[in-house]
Amino acid sequence: MRVTVTGATGRIGTQLVGVLRRRGDEVTVLSRNPDKARAALGVEVHAWQPESEPAPTDALAGRDGVVHLAGEDVAQRWNDDVKRRLLSSRELGTRNLVAGLRAAEPRPGVLVSASAVGYYGPRGEERVTEEAAAGDDFLAQICIIWEREAAAAEQLGVRVVRVRTGIPLDKGGGALAKMLPFFRLGIGGPVAGGHQYMSWIHLDDLVGIYIAALDGSEWSGAVNGTAPAPATNAEFSKALGRALHRPALAPVPSLAIRALYGEMSRIVVTGQRVVPQRVQALGYSFSHSELDEALRSALAG
């Protein structure tokens, strides 16, 4: 299979490229920094400024599939400039990718585009499947626009899969990496009461879902990239403490999270109980469906 990947130097993209190469696929990467990407990944890399130009057709024509992961990192303190980048990197980047697909001949057969469980907004204890309506907060609005731009490729005859990603378990980045220093010191614990759900997923399974979406002609539309058993923040904290053999009893008040992350803290102190109903119906078998085992694996990797 010939696959083009954007956002390939991030934690998800790096592992995805590695898995694709190990199974014998030919991988091409689109990157803002081609020298860095080439050195890190050892694959063919084409320069692309996603917010200002269509994706280069020579990196798309004749490919079997495209995986679109590029976008500004959400896990940072938001201000007006960061919020602008969060939206424009996804809206314009995806629009310009589809513009490149429109000009490519022959076109790839499938586009697998990242989205996020933030699409649903805060949902409390509701069990959220792919059929649930979108939320109305800032992150939900970004996801709606992001998915709309990706879905435009369907008009070109391209099969489109939108992966609403949860919280990847990766000690090298993301939410888990930010939690680890506190838990290792024995000062970690539930955040804002710990009742909010965390829709986690092992990085191996998230990459597995992207590959299944590339390979499977029956995959289309939105799928939830989460493990089957979301946990409350309190349950997650206890499991992480067990994995590290450290106590996890120090509660973190919501005021402290708001002081640290500002508006972005809403993602941390609220949550969604998201389940991968369509992913399981499509036959995907999770390698890491139990939280304690998944955390041990992620920390050992």
What are these regions (language model features)?
Residues 3-23:
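N-terminal Rossmann NAD(P)H-binding glycine-rich loop of SDR-like oxidoreductase domains
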Residues 35, 39-93:
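NAD(P)H-binding glycine-rich loop region in Rossmannoid oxidoreductase-like domains
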Residues 95-137:
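Conserved Rossmann-fold NAD(P)-dependent oxidoreductase catalytic core, especially the SDR/UDP-sugar
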Residues 115, 148-171:
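Conserved beta-loop-beta element that borders a ligand/cofactor-binding pocket
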Residues 156, 169-178, 213-223:
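Glycine/proline-rich active-site loop of Rossmann-fold NAD(P)-dependent oxidoreductases
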Residues 178-201, 205, 212:
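A conserved pocket-lining segment of Rossmann-fold NAD(P)-dependent short-chain dehydrogenase/reductase
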Residues 216-263, 296-301:
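Mid/C-terminal beta-alpha module of Rossmann-like enzyme folds, strongest
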Residues 266-301:
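C-terminal amphipathic/interface module of NAD(P)-dependent oxidoreductases
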